[in-house]
Curated annotation (Swiss-Prot):
<keyword id="KW-0732">Signal</keyword>
<dbReference type="InterPro" id="IPR036249">
    <property type="entry name" value="Thioredoxin-like_sf"/>
</dbReference>
<dbReference type="InterPro" id="IPR023205">
    <property type="entry name" value="DsbA/DsbL"/>
</dbReference>
<comment type="function">
    <text>Required for disulfide bond formation in some periplasmic proteins such as PhoA or OmpA. Acts by transferring its disulfide bond to other proteins and is reduced in the process. DsbA is reoxidized by DsbB. It is required for pilus biogenesis.</text>
</comment>
<keyword id="KW-0574">Periplasm</keyword>
<dbReference type="GO" id="GO:0003756">
    <property type="term" value="F:protein disulfide isomerase activity"/>
</dbReference>
<protein>
    <recommendedName>
        <fullName>Thiol:disulfide interchange protein DsbA</fullName>
    </recommendedName>
</protein>
<dbReference type="GO" id="GO:0030288">
    <property type="term" value="C:outer membrane-bounded periplasmic space"/>
</dbReference>
<feature type="domain" description="Thioredoxin">
    <location>
        <begin position="20"/>
        <end position="149"/>
    </location>
</feature>
<feature type="disulfide bond" description="Redox-active">
    <location>
        <begin position="49"/>
        <end position="52"/>
    </location>
</feature>
<dbReference type="Pfam" id="PF01323">
    <property type="entry name" value="DSBA"/>
</dbReference>
<dbReference type="InterPro" id="IPR050824">
    <property type="entry name" value="Thiol_disulfide_DsbA"/>
</dbReference>
<keyword id="KW-1015">Disulfide bond</keyword>
<dbReference type="InterPro" id="IPR013766">
    <property type="entry name" value="Thioredoxin_domain"/>
</dbReference>
<dbReference type="InterPro" id="IPR001853">
    <property type="entry name" value="DSBA-like_thioredoxin_dom"/>
</dbReference>
<dbReference type="GO" id="GO:0015035">
    <property type="term" value="F:protein-disulfide reductase activity"/>
</dbReference>
<dbReference type="GO" id="GO:0071236">
    <property type="term" value="P:cellular response to antibiotic"/>
</dbReference>
Length: 207
């Protein structure tokens, strides 16, 4: 019984120490005007954004955050349309990926086409990325023109506006907190990613 108690005390102390390391204004910001109705964990990104590429493909922060989330907590990712000549079309394409449930297939291919090979220059090129990912052109076209995708595009636009988004990558928790990307432990990539995920899970417990 004593060992069980000591173990519980250790867990509580460990959580307290971790929580004490996270400070409003350093690792996160509390929004002046919280937005209700937003996803519990919401990330904004753009396929045009070099930092988003590093965030996703090199550091793999979204993957780490998703893995660390408590059971039943969902992470949502929205594309922004204010970057690049095809920003609006890529936001529509991301809505298609969301509707078809192929976000993980599309993400690396689209980043590669937009930033590395620069082969995504037209709406047709965007469509070809989906075909490369195994989605038929017909399915892509049908989804692109669907009510579901139009609604998802509107959701992405409204969330960015309501949260007064100014740049990407950006992650919000419960429509109330924004993670400060520059407030994490930068002593190593692993430490940065772990602390980022820890801050998100910590904020999920805050009222």
């Amino acid at each position: 019984m004593k060992n069980v108690w000591l173990a519980l005390v250790g867990i509580v102390m460990a959580f307290s120490v971790t929580a004490a390391q996270f400070t409003d204004g350093k690792q996160y910001l509390t929004l002046d005007k919280p937005v209700t109705g937003e996803p519990q964990v919401l990330e904004f990104f753009s396929f045009y954004c070099p930092h988003c590429y590093q965030f996703e493909e090199v550091y793999q922060v979204p993957k780490a955050v998703k893995k660390a989330l408590p059971e039943g907590t969902k992470m949502t990712r929205y594309h922004v349309e204010f970057l690049g000549p095809l920003g609006k079309q890529l936001t529509q394409a991301w809505a298609v990926a969301m509707a078809l449930g192929v976000e993980e297939k599309i993400t690396p291919l689209m980043f590669e086409g937009v930033q590395k090979t620069q082969t995504v220059q037209t709406p047709g090129d965007i469509r070809n990325v989906f075909i490369k990912a195994g989605i038929s052109g017909e399915d892509y076209d049908a989804a692109l023109n669907s009510f579901v995708v139009k609604s998802l595009v509107a959701q992405q636009q409204k969330a960015a506006e309501d949260l007064q988004l100014r740049g990407v990558p950006a992650m919000f928790v419960n429509g109330k907190y924004m993670i400060k990307n520059d407030g994490m432990d930068t002593s190593s990539m692993d430490n940065y990613v772990k602390q980022y995920a820890d801050v998100v899970t910590f904020l999920l417990t805050q009222k």
